Structures are given as C-alpha cells and as structure tokens.
C-alpha cells in the first residue's frame, strides 16, 4: 500500500497525492478560505462533482495550463470541452481508471446547473466519487443531502475515508451528516463545505462530538491548507 496525502483546500476542494495527484472540485481563486492560488496546483487529474461555480471553480483554467485529465459527469464534461479544454464524461454507477486511479461515480442529492455569462447551462446530475488511490478507498460525496443508499456505498466500496459536507442550507447539516457516517461506516471522516461563507457557518466540534457518541469513526477536523498523511 502506497502512502496517501490528503490536503484540504477549503470548501469542497481536496488534493489527493500518492504516485499521482488528484484534485477534486478546485474552487480556488474565488474561495475566501483558499490557502493557495490556481497557479500553485499541478494535478495529473481533476475530478468535478457537479457544475456549480463553487465546485467547477478553476477547472478550465488549471486544465488548460497543465493538460491534466478532467473527469466529470457527461454534461459538465461537454461544457468544459465547449471552452476548448478536453474533459472525459462518465455517469453514476460507472468506473473509470485514470493514471492508475479508479474513480467510481456515485449518487448525490443536489442540483448541477452551470451559471456563466448570464446564462444557466445544463450541468446534468450532481454526483460524488469513490476514489481508489494508493491502496485506499476515499469517498467524496460532493454536495448532497443524506440518502439511504449511502449504506450501499459503504457496503460496496468500503471507503476508509469519507469527505462529507456539514454546512446545511445547500447540503447536509450536522444532524444529517452524522447519519451519513452511520450509514457509510468509514474509518475516518473529514467534514467539508462549511464556514466558507456565513450562510454555511457550522461548528465542526459539534459534528465531532455527535459522531463519536454514535460510532467508532474518527473525525479529523482540518484547516484549509492542512494535510493528513495515511
């Protein structure tokens, strides 16, 4: 099993580093909590969970500069390609292997329009990813509410690490995210998508206490720019 380094870049953006570098939802330049600039990032792969601006983020700019491979749901991939940057589409339930990293697209309860240039484009369906990298299974739920088939995700893919939103309003809040942890049963959970803006302000310590009162999952609360090494 190779080493895996996970760095939180604020909001729902993460950099996963093993033999290759995978960047998820690179909302960087407009993210008030971002610890870096898009120019600092040189991923081999970008995975985009859905079309909203705070997730698609700087994907096109980073992709154009680095030539990295971009994976997203079919409609978001088509939008990226319309901007002159190659992207590879997939859909829920499917798995693609890119640079030795397997990405399985999972269900998410959210929306996915792409708002740009005064128009709203079809962004298909929102999604999450189960990522097999460096011998580890990592579940990034994307923006989502809690849903019963999270238990199926846990049974099928057995993610050791879950990256889950707790901000409420647009995603799960703390109560729902705790239930998600119960359903998935990961070894580690990292809360995300909170405190970027006042409208999604939450206390992650409240989440930690609620999780640890119910299950054996370890809660790791990260600061933007902080990394964990597995």
Curated annotation (Swiss-Prot):
SUPFAM superfamilies named in the record: Metallo-hydrolase/oxidoreductase
Query: Which GO terms fall under molecular function for this chain's record?
Result: hydrolase activity
Keywords of this entry:
Hydrolase
Q: Which domain of life is it from?
A: Archaea
Name the InterPro entries on file. Answer: Metallo-B-lactamas, RibonucZ/Hydroxyglut_hydro, UPF0173, UPF0173_UPF0282_UlaG_hydrolase
Which NCBIfam families does the entry link to? Answer: PRK00685.1
HAMAP family named in the record: UPF0173 (MF_00457)
Q: Which PANTHER family match?
A: UPF0173 METAL-DEPENDENT HYDROLASE MJ1163 (PTHR43546:SF3), UPF0173 METAL-DEPENDENT HYDROLASE MJ1163-RELATED (PTHR43546)
Instruction: Give the family from UniProt.
Output: Belongs to the UPF0173 family.
This one is known as: UPF0173 metal-dependent hydrolase MM_2300
